[in-house]
Amino acid sequence: RLYEGDKLKDIYTTPFGIRSIEIIPDKGFFLNGKRTVFKGVCNHHDLGPLGAAVNDAAIRRQIRILKDMGCNAIRTSHNMPAPELIRACDEMGMMIMAESFDEWNVAKCKNGYNLLFDEWAEKDLVNLLHNFRNNPSVVMWCIGNEVPNQWNEGDCKIAKWLQDICHREDPTRPVTQGMDAPDAVVNNNFAAVMDVAGFNYRPFKYKINYKKLPQRIVLGSETASTVSSRGVYKFPVERKAMAKYDDHQASSYDVEHCGWSNLPEDDFIQHEDLPYCIGEFVWTGFDYLGEPTPYYTDWPSHSSLF
């Protein structure tokens, strides 16, 4: 309540929760004092045929399905989440990695956020932090996804600038980003400046990169990208990358993946065997419109197979 003298001027109500989070080098992520591995998924904000408009019942349905299969975390790929999602995760017990940007000041696409980054990045990031820093389900901030800046010498300064904003507005949570150029980022300090080094794909690089990281912690910020079509089985059953068929489907045996990705067990092995791996966020929790890999130009393919 805000008073001017004895006169009530404003009332603000905010939900909150009490829990502890800690990341210990070489040992992992601890939630309420217990070592916890992220068994997460990346999820776009759209709700399939319902579209991108927020639907509380549909959001909660997705969370129930994810929890039923053993998922304990969602990465909001690749944008700031709706308040309805965060509230539902608070109530239903799902951890959140809240992501902010898919692009900084180097373009992924001609008419992208790069045109607005210099003016709006701090304002937009502060808005995210202020909106959700009281929500217990949010356990980590993510400041970027596969940004082209990761290749540039010196752009680790931008990463540190964004991370410092997160620390300034919320000193209680670690900060990460999803990086898909593991060799570049460990050699140009792009990964070293982060609280948590998040790697997209290439789990076979974890052991190599761990030795070069001062944090001594590795996160699979985006993993797998295995493709499959429900009820479709291809023979012979063999592992394939970017396999294409006349029916524009993929085998439901989960043995097919993209050129840059791998099968789920490739990631599972790393996170089960390596104590410094704190878990992963599989691509993707639910199918979405767009990216019909490997059928990019094959009409009428328009939905993802991940």
PLM ranges: what are they?
Residues K9-F306:
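Extended substrate-binding grooves/exosites of carbohydrate-active enzymes
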